[in-house]
């Protein structure tokens, strides 16, 4: 049972009164990692993110991509999936709480298609009938073996697997 709460002052109410299992750590760690990766702030500011939720850390769901956010590899974020590796390390290894990997993130999905109602915005649509090319190639006609992925996509997927194995 996961909540998306944008007011950190309400986090504990959602956990203890609303009985949510997890809260997306959006306005804390996600926003801070994105700002650090863009050069808008120092990595030292990450400390305040985990300190502010230290007592409820096991209820925080870390993520770097989801249906609302721009893809790391998109032109609207980092422009290259490899630039997301430091964020992945921090997000996955800083604490013992869960880490969500979103639909093709580990393949470097760019979200740069102009599909359906959403247009070209660096996100992957969730509303339209659409084929996400990285997922289609990973599926490989139902074999789910990744044989059609590029070498770079395979390497990135292996990197994600190694990091997640450590977490």
Set out the residue ranges of the language-model regions.
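Aromatic-lined carbohydrate-recognition surfaces of secreted/lumenal glycan-active proteins
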Residues: 1-11, 24
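Loop/helix patches that line or flank the sugar-binding groove of alpha-linked glycan CAZymes
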Residues: 7, 31-34, 44-47, 54-66, ...
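Short, charged, surface-exposed secondary-structure boundary motifs
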Residues: 11-14, 30-38
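A short acidic (Asp/Glu
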Residues: 12-15, 112-114
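Short, hinge-like loop/turn segments at secondary-structure boundaries
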Residues: 17-22, 118-119
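A polyampholytic, Gly/Pro-enriched intrinsically disordered region
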Residues: 22-29, 46-48
């Amino acid at each position: 049972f996961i909540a998306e709460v944008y007011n950190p002052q309400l986090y504990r109410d959602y956990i203890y009164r609303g009985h949510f299992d997890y809260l997306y750590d959006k306005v804390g760690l996600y926003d801070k990692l994105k700002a650090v990766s863009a050069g808008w702030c120092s990595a030292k500011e990450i400390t305040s993110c985990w300190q502010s939720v230290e007592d409820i850390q096991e209820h925080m769901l870390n993520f770097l991509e989801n249906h609302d956010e721009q893809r790391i590899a998109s032109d609207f974020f980092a422009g290259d999936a490899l630039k997301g590796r430091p964020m992945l390390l921090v997000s996955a290894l800083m604490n013992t709480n869960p880490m969500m990997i979103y639909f093709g993130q580990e393949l470097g999905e760019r979200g740069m298609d102009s599909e359906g109602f959403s247009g070209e915005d660096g996100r992957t649509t969730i509303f339209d009938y659409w084929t996400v090319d990285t997922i289609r190639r990973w599926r490989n006609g139902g074999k789910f073996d990744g044989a059609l992925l590029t070498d770079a996509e395979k390497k990135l997927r292996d990197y994600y697997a190694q990091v997640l194995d450590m977490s």
